[in-house]
Amino acid sequence: MLARAPPPYFNFPARNNTICNRNEIVRLFRNGGGVVARGAGFTRRPLETSSSYDDSTDDGFVIISAADKENEFAPPPSSDLLSSIPSESARRNGSRSRGLTASFGRLKAQKVKALVGKVTQKKQHMSHNEEEDEDDASDENYSADEGFGSSSILDLMRKKLAMKAIPRSGKSAERNEVKRASKVRESRESRRDLDRLEGDDEDVDEVSNPDRFTDNQRAGSRSSYSKGGYAANSRGKGDRLSVARDLDSFEGHGRAIDEVSNPRKFNDNERAESRSSYSRDSSANSRGREDRRFVAKELDTFQGRDKAYDEVYNPRRFTDNERGLRGGSHSKGSDTNSRGWGDRRSVVYTRDMDDWRERNKTKDTRETGFFSRKTFAEIGCSEDMMKALKEQNFDRPAHIQAMAFSPVIDGKSCIIADQSGSGKTLAYLVPVIQRLREEELQGHSKSSPGCPRVIVLVPTAELASQVLANCRSISKSGVPFRSMVVTGGFRQRTQLENLEQGVDVLIATPGRFTYLMNEGILGLSNLRCAILDEVDILFGDDEFEAALQNLINSSPVTAQYLFVTATLPLEIYNKLVEVFPDCEVVMGPRVHRVSNALEEFLVDCSGDDNAEKTPETAFQNKKTALLQIMEENPVSKTIIFCNKIETCRKVENIFKRVDRKERQLHVLPFHAALSQESRLTNMQEFTSSQPEENSLFLVCTDRASRGIDFSGVDHVVLFDFPRDPSEYVRRVGRTARGARGKGKAFIFVVGKQVGLARRIIERNEKGHPVHDVPNAYEFTT
């Protein structure tokens, strides 16, 4: 059995989806220019089957008819037969058997003779021009250099014989004639010249007189083109239709460009139908219709005539259902998108339009934008809970509260993420407490000594005290339940006594929680829900890994887990979805974003270019800037963030030297060097005081940025630039909190920090997140 030579290894061009750069389109329109048509880009990939080789049409590719393919160009045999053909080096070494060598030589000789004889007969009634003779000469020189024993001999002979058998007129004399396809990348100018030489064909008339042809006629002609034999019509009608499609796309004579220049003539259904029909077209129509639809879509997007872009500048024309439907289409993506990190088209970014609109609204409009359009009754709050919230002056839920209520009260594990000051504490407390109260009234569950029904883990004792204050406010307003805090710095005996009396909600830090679990004092057999507040900070605690493992191993399988955070970095998100793959992800509208009411000011403290750059000179420049801000913008409350405790103490000394008797300036330190009692006292004084004559300054480290709600803060000063962009969001988020909050942030930077801070502020001004957020499920509010 003789082995057949393998076919040549050809590539065919695949259409590239993009014909031009989007950023360049935007720049051209902003500068008053127009879109310049560019040649479509192509990528190449190897063919997988022999049949696909016959369908290839690129520079120098050969189109083989059915009869020729059966006779001269037979498809290759199976892989085992091809593997029996030795390489050229093996032939030189004589390692191949003599019988196979002789058989293979006779096979090639017979094939070559058959090809030469057939082509010689065909050449008698074929005309050739000078250009073809030059190509033949070049091919002869090239093939003469190759040895007959080369593995690519049939490939070279095919090209040579096929090029000699190609008539330039584009008209077929015989059905089985071997033709050469026109070059895909041939310029449009030459194609137009060719069309003019061939006369007023119907296809050319369609380009020059588009009004004479309806869309059905134009579509029918292109459909017939795609269904016809491309090998026979590639030089004639195929080229003319390619010109027609190019002119339709870039010169404005087609329906797609008319749709761009006259958008009012087309409704949304017609535009959607046209784009849907594009997706159903054959590959032969991709050159024309794809270009027209893509250009139309690009121009619609960047000129403001697309529905998505029009939604930004004309928000009143779109209802919440329409906007939610657009966002929901993103959430139905693949597993990769739901668990990955998205670009501008992720689910979370569907709400960016609301943020851009809010920046141009007045103060009163901005206040209403903080709350959801739904009421507490509409999201499912009970009468007792609504009464308790009403007493605390909560009339409507915030966005994150409305979004998280339904999955939390249903007992689903969730990741709840939104910006600082958005109301995340009540977003998980209200539904959890309501569910506990309903279960207690129905007799399904009840608190027992040493076994709380809800555990809240927080990173700091100050945040634990804040959560406890919220729990007691709800309890005193008509929804009774018991809550307590177990943290370091308090008498342990008192905490244990209260725990033995029975508690519904236990708030603890990871260290104290681990201690109670190891000592056997705390039991989790009755646990209904575990809440991890500021989970991104908890993962940075050395004791948290052990605390989380104890929590998972000791709690019932039916326990609910809630992970709450203002920032959700990639590594934290991956850890959560790996351990809890069934979590619902509730993303607020402003994750990783600063408040709309926040004003940011970049202060370059690098000094003069000729001055010496040292840490001491940088500190002196920051000191001068701080005193200048204090004198020119006197306010009631200011928080100053430093990276180190040592820097905090230096800043404290600056204020003490300015006002030793603290008649106008009152400084309150807040960092780990102080005892917990001192920190809580200073925090309480700073949050509850309303000074009228003097100004309060809280000098702190990042400990104060971890979830603590500082109400009424006017200014935030970043004396040291944060090491992490996520920390930037938490620091500046201490001001401009809530619906009516507003404030200013002054960022001191030196050296390379200037460029990084400028990019962050520019992104904030545009409403973009400081860094990406994951694609996730989202609930309509």
Curated annotation (Swiss-Prot):
GO cellular component: chloroplast
Record domain Helicase C-terminal: where: 621-781
Gene Ontology MF: a single term: ATP hydrolysis activity
Domain Helicase ATP-binding: 405-586
InterPro entries: DEAD/DEAH_box_helicase_dom, Helicase_ATP-bd, Helicase_C-like, P-loop_NTPase, RNA_helicase_DEAD_Q_motif
Domain of life: Eukaryota
PROSITE patterns in the record: HELICASE_ATP_BIND_1, HELICASE_CTER, Q_MOTIF
Region (Disordered): 72-103, 117-148, 166-240, 254-292, 313-342
Residue span of motif DEAD box: 533-536
Residue spans of biased composition, Polar residues class: 216-226
Family matches, as Pfam families: DEAD, Helicase_C
Enzyme Commission number, as recorded: 3.6.4.13
UniProt feature, compositional bias: Low complexity: 79-88, 275-286
GO BP, sorted A to Z: cellular defense response; cellular response to ethylene stimulus; cellular response to jasmonic acid stimulus; cellular response to salicylic acid stimulus; defense response to fungus
Keywords on record: ATP-binding, Helicase, Hydrolase, Nucleotide-binding, Plant defense, RNA-binding
Catalytic activity: ATP + H2O = ADP + phosphate + H(+)
Residues that coordinate or bind ATP: D418, Q419, S420, G421, S422, G423, K424, T425
Motif window: Q motif: 374-402
SMART domains linked: DEXDc, HELICc
Acidic residues bias locations: 130-143, 198-208
Basic and acidic residues bias locations: 171-197, 254-274, 313-325
Enzyme class: hydrolase
Domain notes: The Q motif is unique to and characteristic of the DEAD box family of RNA helicases and controls ATP binding and hydrolysis.
Membership in a protein family: Belongs to the DEAD box helicase family.
Summary of the function given for this chain in its UniProt record: Probably involved in resistance to biotic and abiotic stresses.
Name of this protein: DEAD-box ATP-dependent RNA helicase 50
Biological classification of the source: Eukaryota, Viridiplantae, Streptophyta, Embryophyta, Tracheophyta
